[in-house]
C-alpha cells in the first residue's frame, strides 16, 4: 500500500512543533492502521519508545484505541513532564507510566503488549532486538535524514532493517519540508 501525500514539515522541538501537519498526518496514519489491525481488541500496555512530548497518547485516544496503559519511554525528563501534563487524566487513573531511560534498555513483561516507535532512525536497532517475539509492533522511519543511527533511504532498506514474523501493513507517505521532499515509512506486524 503506497500513499503519496505531500505535507509541509516544519517541526521544531517544542510541544507545538510536535503537532505540525506532517507529524499529525503520520500519527493519524499510524492510528488508523493500528486500529484496523486490533479490530476492537485491546492493545494491552502500549510502549511508546522515544515518546517526545507524549502526544502519541492523544492520537491513540482520539482514534478510540483500547489499551490498558501507555508507557512513555524518553531520555529527556522535561519531555516526560510535558507528557504527564498533556495526558493528566490518564496519569490520575494510573494508566500512564513515564519511564526515563533508553528504549534499548527496556525489559518487557511476559504478556501481550504493543510497541510503537516513530523514531526508529534515532535509535540503534537494539531496541528492536529486545522486543519479545510475537509482539504487535508499529515502526515509522524516514529517508533523507543525516546523522542518524539507522539509515532508511529506501523502502527496501526500511523493510529489511525491521523484520517481522507477520507483517500486516506496510506503506509509505510522501512529505515535504522546507529543504527537501522525503518519504515516511511505516510497518505494522508481529515480531
Describe the function of each predicted region:
Residues 1-41, 75-112:
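S-adenosyl-L-methionine
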Residues 41-54:
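Conserved class I S-adenosyl-L-methionine
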Residues 53-66:
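Conserved SAM-binding loop of SAM-dependent methyltransferases across substrates and taxa
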Residues 53-56, 76-78, 103-106, 119-124, ...:
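Short acidic, S/G/P-rich loop/turn micro-motifs used as interaction or catalytic elements
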Residues 68-74:
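Conserved SAM-binding motif I beta-strand of class I
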Residues 110-120:
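Short SAM/SAH-binding signature in class I
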Residues 123-190:
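C-terminal substrate-binding/active-site "lid" region of AdoMet-derived donor-dependent transferases
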Amino acid at each position: 500500500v503506497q500513499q503519496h501525500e505531500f505535507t509541509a514539515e516544519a517541526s521544531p522541538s517544542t510541544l507545538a512543533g510536535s503537532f505540525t501537519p506532517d507529524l499529525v498526518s503520520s500519527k493519524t496514519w499510524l492510528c488508523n492502521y493500528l486500529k484496523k489491525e486490533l479490530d476492537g481488541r485491546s492493545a494491552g500496555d502500549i510502549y511508546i519508545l522515544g515518546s517526545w512530548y507524549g502526544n502519541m497518547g492523544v492520537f491513540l485516544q482520539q482514534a478510540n484505541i483500547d489499551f490498558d496503559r501507555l508507557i512513555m519511554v524518553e531520555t529527556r525528563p522535561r519531555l516526560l513532564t510535558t507528557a504527564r501534563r498533556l495526558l493528566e487524566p490518564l496519569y490520575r487513573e494510573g494508566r500512564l507510566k513515564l519511564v526515563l531511560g533508553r528504549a534499548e534498555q527496556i525489559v518487557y513483561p511476559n504478556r501481550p503488549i504493543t510497541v510503537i516507535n516513530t523514531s526508529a532512525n534515532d535509535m540503534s536497532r537494539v531496541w528492536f532486538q529486545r522486543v519479545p517475539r510475537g509482539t504487535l509492533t508499529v515502526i515509522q522511519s524516514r529517508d533523507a535524514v543525516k546523522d542518524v543511527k539507522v539509515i532508511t533511504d529506501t523502502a527496501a532498506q526500511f523493510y529489511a532493517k525491521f523484520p517481522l514474523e507477520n507483517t500486516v501493513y506496510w506503506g509509505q507517505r510522501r512529505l515535504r519540508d522546507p529543504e527537501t521532499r522525503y518519504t515516511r515509512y511505516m510497518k505494522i506486524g508481529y515480531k
